[in-house]
C-alpha cells in the first residue's frame, strides 16, 4: 500500500514541477520587461544626451576673461491632469513617465537650474481649491529636486486660464506656489520670465500690472548697459550687463509653423494653418513690445507642443520647446542649454518614444502567450517544428 501511494505521489510531482517552472519563467520575463520599460529605458535614452560645448572666454579688446557656464534645462507643457479630464490610467501612466524622465535627467545630467515654460497643470484654469492643492502636491512629488538645483516656472493658459478666464485669484494662487519672480540673474546671466497670458493689450487690470512690471525690468536692464553711476538709474544694485533670455508660455507672433522642420515639429498637414493672435501666439503688437523693451538675445516658449525655431527681425532666435508629456506627443523632449553672459549653445534631449514602449509590451505579451501554449502542448514548439522541417528536407 505504501508503494502504491509513493508512486501516486511521484506521478503528481512532475506536473506540479512543470507548472512551477512555467510560473517562474513568466514572473522573470514580466519583471525584466517592467524593469526595462519603466526604469532602464529612461537611462538608456538620456545617457545619450550631453551638455553642448560653449565658448567660455570673452575679450573686451584689452584682456581675455574666462566666463562661468550655467547648465540650464528647459521643458514645457507637462499638463498634469486634474479631477475632471482624463482616465485614471492615463493620469497614472503619463505622470509616471514624466517623473521617471525628470528624475533620471537630474541624476545623469546634473543641471543647475530647470525652467518649465507654462501649462504645468491641465485644469488649473477651473480647478477647485481642493483639486488645486492635490495637483500641486503631485507636481512637487514628480518634480522634486535637490536644494542646489533651482526650479523656475512661468504661467500658462491652462494654469491660470486664457485671458478671458484669468482673474486675480487664479494668478495669485499660482504665484503663491511658484513665485511672482519676473527677473532671475545667475552667473552673470539675466532671465526674464513673462506671464504671456496677461499681454492681451486690452488694458485689463492684470494686463496693465504686467506691462508696468516689464517696463520696470526694461529700465533695470537698460541701466545695466549704461555707464555705472548714471543719474537716471539711481543708487540701487545693477544687474549683469548681458542681454537677457526671455522665457514665456506663448510664442512670439508668427503666422504659422510653415517654416518649422524636424522630427518633433508639428505634423505636415498642420504647419500651414494660420495662428490666432492671443490664442496660439502673442499678438504682433505685444511681441514687438517685448522685443523693444527687453532686447533679448534668445527667446524660449512652449504652448504649441511642437518644436520650431524662428528668427525675429532676422537677429533674435526663438525656440518653441516641445511638450514633455506622452499625452501631447509620441516623442517628448527637453532643451539643454550651456549659457554664459555673452554666448550660449542649445541641444535637444529626446525621451523614450511611447510607441516603442508599447511595441515592447505587445511583443512580450505575444511571447508569453506562445510560451504558455507551448508548455501545455496546445501549440507545437517553434524550435521543434523547425528541427522537424529541417529533418524532412534532409531525408529528401
From Swiss-Prot:
Keyword Metal-binding: yes
Effect on the protein upon substituting residue 77 to A: Affects transport of GPI-anchor proteins
GO annotation, biological process: endoplasmic reticulum to Golgi vesicle-mediated transport; GPI anchor biosynthetic process
TM annotation in the entry: 27-47, 356-376
Cell location: Endoplasmic reticulum-Golgi intermediate compartment membrane
UniProt motif (Di-lysine motif) ranges: 392-396
Record-linked InterPro entries: Calcineurin-like_PHP_ApaH, Metallo-depent_PP-like, MPP_MPPE1, PGAP5/Cdc1/Ted1
Enzyme class: hydrolase
Entry keywords, A to Z: ER-Golgi transport, GPI-anchor biosynthesis, Hydrolase, Manganese, Membrane, Metal-binding, Transmembrane, Transmembrane helix, Transport
Gene Ontology molecular function: GPI-mannose ethanolamine phosphate phosphodiesterase activity; manganese ion binding
pH dependence: Optimum pH is 7.0-7.5.
Binding locations of a divalent metal cation 1: 119, 157, 249, 303
CDD domains: MPP_MPPE1
Cofactor(s) the protein requires to work: Mn(2+)
Domain remarks: The di-lysine motif (KxKxx) acts as an endoplasmic reticulum retrieval signal.
Protein name per UniProt: Metallophosphoesterase 1
Amino acid at each position: 500500500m505504501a508503494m502504491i501511494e509513493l508512486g501516486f505521489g511521484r506521478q503528481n510531482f512532475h506536473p506540479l514541477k512543470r507548472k512551477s517552472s512555467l510560473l517562474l519563467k513568466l514572473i522573470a520575463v514580466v519583471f525584466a520587461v517592467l524593469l526595462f520599460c519603466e526604469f532602464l529605458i529612461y537611462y538608456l535614452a538620456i545617457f545619450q544626451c550631453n551638455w553642448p560645448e560653449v565658448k567660455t572666454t570673452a575679450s573686451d579688446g584689452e584682456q581675455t576673461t574666462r566666463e562661468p557656464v550655467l547648465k540650464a534645462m528647459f521643458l514645457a507643457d507637462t499638463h498634469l491632469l486634474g479631477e475632471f479630464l482624463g482616465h485614471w490610467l492615463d493620469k497614472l501612466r503619463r505622470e509616471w513617465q514624466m517623473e521617471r524622465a525628470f528624475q533620471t535627467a537630474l541624476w545623469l545630467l546634473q543641471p543647475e537650474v530647470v525652467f518649465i515654460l507654462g501649462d504645468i497643470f491641465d485644469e488649473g484654469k477651473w480647478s477647485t481649491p481642493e483639486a488645486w492643492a492635490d495637483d500641486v502636491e503631485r507636481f512637487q512629488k514628480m518634480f522634486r529636486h535637490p536644494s542646489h538645483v533651482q526650479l523656475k516656472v512661468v504661467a500658462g493658459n491652462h494654469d491660470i486660464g486664457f485671458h478671458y478666464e484669468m482673474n486675480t485669484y487664479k494668478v495669485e494662487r499660482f504665484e503663491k506656489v511658484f513665485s511672482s519672480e519676473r527677473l532671475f540673474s545667475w552667473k552673470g546671466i539675466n532671465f526674464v520670465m513673462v506671464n504671456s497670458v496677461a499681454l492681451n493689450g486690452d488694458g485689463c487690470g492684470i494686463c496693465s500690472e504686467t506691462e508696468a512690471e516689464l517696463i520696470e525690468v526694461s529700465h533695470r536692464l537698460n541701466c545695466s548697459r549704461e555707464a555705472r553711476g548714471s543719474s537716471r538709474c539711481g543708487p540701487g544694485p545693477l544687474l549683469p550687463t548681458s542681454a537677457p533670455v526671455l522665457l514665456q508660455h506663448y510664442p512670439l507672433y508668427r503666422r504659422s509653423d510653415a517654416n518649422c522642420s524636424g522630427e518633433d515639429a508639428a505634423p505636415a498637414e498642420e504647419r500651414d494653418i494660420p495662428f490666432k493672435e492671443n490664442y496660439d501666439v502673442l499678438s504682433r503688437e505685444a511681441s514687438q513690445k517685448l522685443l523693444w523693451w527687453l532686447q533679448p538675445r534668445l527667446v524660449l516658449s512652449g504652448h504649441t507642443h511642437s518644436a520650431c525655431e524662428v528668427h525675429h527681425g532676422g537677429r533674435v532666435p526663438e525656440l518653441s520647446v516641445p511638450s514633455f508629456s506622452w499625452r501631447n506627443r509620441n516623442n517628448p523632449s527637453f532643451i539643454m542649454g550651456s549659457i554664459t553672459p555673452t554666448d550660449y549653445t542649445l541641444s535637444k534631449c529626446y525621451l523614450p518614444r511611447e510607441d516603442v514602449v508599447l511595441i515592447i509590451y505587445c511583443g512580450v505579451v505575444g511571447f508569453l502567450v506562445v510560451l504558455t501554449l507551448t508548455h501545455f502542448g496546445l501549440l507545437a514548439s517553434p524550435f521543434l517544428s523547425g528541427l522537424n522541417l529541417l529533418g524532412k528536407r534532409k531525408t529528401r
